[in-house]
A protein has these predicted regions:
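Hydrophobic alpha-helical connector segments
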Residues: 2-36
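Amphipathic alpha-helices of TPR/Sel1-like and other helical repeat/solenoid scaffolds
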Residues: 19, 23, 60-64, 111-112
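Hydrophobic/aromatic-rich alpha-helical bundle segments in the mid-to-C-terminal region
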Residues: 50-54, 65-119, 123-129
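Short linear capping/connector segments at secondary-structure termini
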Residues: 4-6, 38-42, 99
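Amphipathic alpha-helical segments used for helix-helix packing
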Residues: 28-56
């Protein structure tokens, strides 16, 4: 995948920021956002569209990043990342939460990037965090 090729040169400690920058930069452009939003709407009522969206975001975006990092439970981490990204995308670009639409993209990249970084590289369970 394109992301898989690009992510090779990104230091592990910056993969969350990289993902956030790529995702927000992509969604900020109408020509990219509109087809994704259409697919999301379709996925809400059509299982085939839902499967296409799941595959698109995990195979082409989140799973290559998790595999690059080499973290445990890659499928779970990729799904969690997809949920965070899609939730953010819906909240900013479809539901238009004012706090998200009025905050500069660069600031959102930093905040979302930290969350994505945690999901990529930190222990997932409380037991793992304590050991």
């Amino acid at each position: 995948s394109q992301v898989g090729a690009q992510i090779r040169d990104v230091p592990t400690e910056h993969v969350g920021e990289y993902m956030a920058r790529l995702f927000i930069g992509h969604w900020d452009r109408d020509e990219h956002r509109n087809p994704i939003v259409s697919l999301i709407y379709a996925a809400l009522s059509d299982t085939t569209a839902a499967a296409m969206l799941r595959e698109f975001i995990t195979v082409n975006f989140t799973l290559p990043v998790v595999e690059r990092v080499g973290a445990d439970r890659p499928q779970l981490r990729a799904a969690l990342l997809a949920a965070q990204l899609l939730g953010f995308g819906l909240s900013r670009y479809v539901l238009a939460f004012d706090a998200l639409t009025s905050t500069p993209s660069a600031e959102l990249v930093a905040v979302l990037g930290a969350t994505l970084q945690h999901t990529c590289t930190s222990p997932l369970s409380a037991a793992e965090r304590q050991s």
